[in-house]
Amino acid sequence: VGRALIADSADRVLKVSMELGGNAPFIVFEDADLDKAVDGAMLAKLRNMGEACTAANRMIVHESVAAEFSKRLADKMAKLKVSRGTEDGANIGPLIDDKSRNTVHALVADAVSKGAKVLTGGAIPTGEGYFYPPTVLVDVPVNAEILKEEIFGPVAPVVTFKNEDEAVKIANSTEYGLIAYAFTKDLN
């Protein structure tokens, strides 16, 4: 679609700026301030219910802090109110449509079927609307589709790394390279 739009725009000599998709890594190093990292993850993952090409898609967390980071993230996400934006206290609204919600849930179900564990969320709620709860997955295997595809929903799959080289390798293991997030006290 992007190529077709660019070609059409070029034929008419139009300026073009496009956001064509992302699979943003959110890297948390062992020296990161976990409170700041969790707050950053909440913002980077849940802006517009995760339906943004710049949303953090894959939480890549050093193995020494992964359990604590995942627990804190799941605890914060579990406290969010999923409802219509017109309701008092609403934090997370619906996804754009039923197809999108089903796609998000299929990615979660695929990860779980391959061994991922759900810390919070992970199920389509009953009732009206295209709601999907904020979800944290841990022990996500590398062959899970959720690590390869843009999620476009409020789901945070957590994978671990042992060293910086491995973190970079995991972060770069996608064809989408729009944006990346990193939490560390040492940028060197």
Where are the predicted features?
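Conserved glycine-rich beta-strand-loop-beta hairpin in the small C-terminal domain of fold type I
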Residues: A90-N91, G129-Y132, E149-V155, T174-L178
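Active-site donor-binding acidic/aromatic loop of nucleotide-activated sugar
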Residues: P157-V159
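Short amphipathic N-terminal alpha-helix
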Residues: A180-F183
